[in-house]
Design a protein with these regions (language model features):
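Conserved beta-sheet core of the metallophosphoesterase superfamily
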Residues: 199-308
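Active-site environment of divalent metal-dependent phosphoester hydrolases
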Residues: 12-13, 51-54, 81-92, 111-115, ...
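Metal-dependent catalytic neighborhoods of phosphoester/phosphodiester hydrolases
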Residues: 15-17, 49-67, 82-107, 273-275
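N-terminal active-site segment of His-dependent metallophosphoesterases
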Residues: 1-68, 75
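Active-site neighborhood of phospho(di)ester-bond hydrolases with catalytic His/Asp-centered motifs
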Residues: 6-7, 43-47, 77-84, 104-109, ...
Length: 450
């Protein structure tokens, strides 16, 4: 069975107030052509179809038009599962209509049983070619309720186990049901998931150069009015909303080793889990933060048979929009902007830039770079200044102004570091930050509401 594995489209995303409709439209057209080109019999979308739970009409129209366009191809199966950015209810709402078109949607596990998560995949002639255990993003409470609503799990377990044990049990249960459905047929069994797995292979190597030196970078909120609303929830601007609880650090042993492939979503970089070629993240086809600007984007073409190692081809997604992140002192930033302008004159492309002042004296980047930014073929969306530069600020007024550089997430990290008496970039601080940042953001949001 040959299929395309993709995830984390985040349709409707407006990173730093950028309208990305044309960019996402170009990707969907390209994806359809790639599906036809590789002869994919199925498409698996592993969560985060949309960027928010209430996506715009434009985003929803793009999604449904794309699904409809696949009816004209030989891709006879589409599997869509919900992610943490999605509304499971919204995804599930048209399931009856989509099901008739062999487009299977599992927005959430609410009001479902184990059997409802098992989907048989068929070719254009109606012959079975595989089975998919379609598991969406699950919050801890949803998983607990899932088993409380069931008389018992397939193996007789109960809902009193830990959340990580319940997740492992659910994957075991759906796999066991898939085995029963397969019978004596020789067809592969795959699964989906939208979660944060531990021990990601390749991710650190891919992004280490990109993120080097960025840990001390903070937001210059005084430069662009209203920008804070568009800043990512994570301190490193990768657009991934943290998963709180035990489901936020899933071990590879959670997935039955007999599964022929596990298609994951949530991480925006193409990665293997624990160096296991059968358990992979496709990554997002789009840049979700300026620190991702230089990372290539992929979809995965997977060819899998029962009991064999899958053949996986990384297909690079062409860029429809260019993102650049430049760092250095003022003169370095000026030169990089001049070079970029020359490149865009020779080869025009819609381009957005993030500037990081990481050395030299504290200056207003608005004033210092006005000549290099005004009337050019690119748009600078953000100015930032590193903490190292801010530490050199001498005057009281500049010190007061420098506090505006920090986001609420930065202050939360500093609070954790103070309580732990650790450096704010230490592993201990990072672990606590990752564990509680979503709860912190939720509390801040509710405080603003009430």
């Amino acid at each position: 069975m040959k299929f395309i594995h993709t995830a984390d489209w985040h349709l409707g995303n407006t990173m730093h107030d950028i309208d990305r409709t044309r960019e996402t439209g170009a990707f969907l057209e390209w994806l359809k052509s790639e599906i036809e080109k590789v002869g994919a019999q199925a498409l698996v979308i592993a969560g985060d179809v949309f960027d928010v739970v209430n996506p715009s009409n434009i985003a929803k129209t793009q999604y449904y038009k794309f699904l409809a366009s696949l009816l004209k191809t030989n891709c006879s199966n589409v599997i869509v599962v919900g992610g943490n950015h999605d509304s499971g209810t919204l995804l599930d709402a048209p399931a009856g209509i989509l099901d008739a078109l062999n487009i299977k949607v599992v927005g959430s596990i609410n009001n479902r049983k184990v059997d409802d998560l098992i989907i048989e995949l068929k070719d254009a002639q109606g012959d079975a070619i595989g089975i998919c255990c379609a598991l969406p993003f699950m919050r801890d409470l949803e998983l607990e309720q899932f088993y409380k609503n069931s008389e018992k799990s397939v193996d007789g377990g109960n809902a009193n186990a830990s959340d990580s044990d319940l997740l492992k049990r659910l994957y075991a249960d759906v796999y066991r049901c898939a085995i029963e459905l397969r019978g004596n047929r020789t067809i592969p069994i795959i699964a989906t998931g939208h979660l944060y797995a531990s021990n990601l292979s390749g991710r650190d190597a891919e992004i280490s150069d990109v993120r080097a030196g960025l840990d001390n970078v903070t937001e210059n909120a005084n430069t662009f009015a209203g920008e804070n609303a568009a800043v990512s929830e994570t301190s490193v601007d990768d657009g991934v909303r943290e998963v709180v609880g035990t489901l936020g650090n899933v071990d590879v042993s959670t997935f039955p080793s007999e599964l022929d492939y596990v298609a994951l979503g949530h991480i925006h970089y193409t990665s293997m889990v624990a160096k296991n070629p059968k358990v992979r993240y496709s990554g997002s086809p789009f840049v979700m933060g300026f620190d991702e600007a230089n990372c290539k984007r992929y979809v995965l073409a997977v060819d899998v048979e029962q009991g064999d190692a899958p053949s996986v081809e990384k297909i690079e997604v062409p860029k429809a929009v260019r993102f650049e992140q430049f760092k250095g002192d003022v003169e370095t930033l000026k030169q990089k902007l001049r070079n970029l302008e020359k490149e865009l004159i020779a080869k025009p492309m819609e381009t957005y830039v993030d500037l990081l002042l990481t050395s030299g004296e504290f200056v207003s980047l608005n004033d210092a770079l006005e000549a290099e930014e005004s009337g050019k073929h690119f748009v600078v969306k953000r100015h930032r200044i590193s903490r190292d530069v801010l530490r050199g600020v001498a005057s009281f007024d500049d010190c007061v102004e420098s506090t505006k550089q920090y986001t609420k997430e930065d202050y939360f990290r500093m609070l954790i570091a103070s309580n732990l008496q650790e450096n704010d970039e230490s592993d201990a601080v990072k672990n606590q930050y990752d564990k509680f940042i979503s709860l912190f953001n939720e509390a801040v949001s509710k405080a603003h509401e009430g």
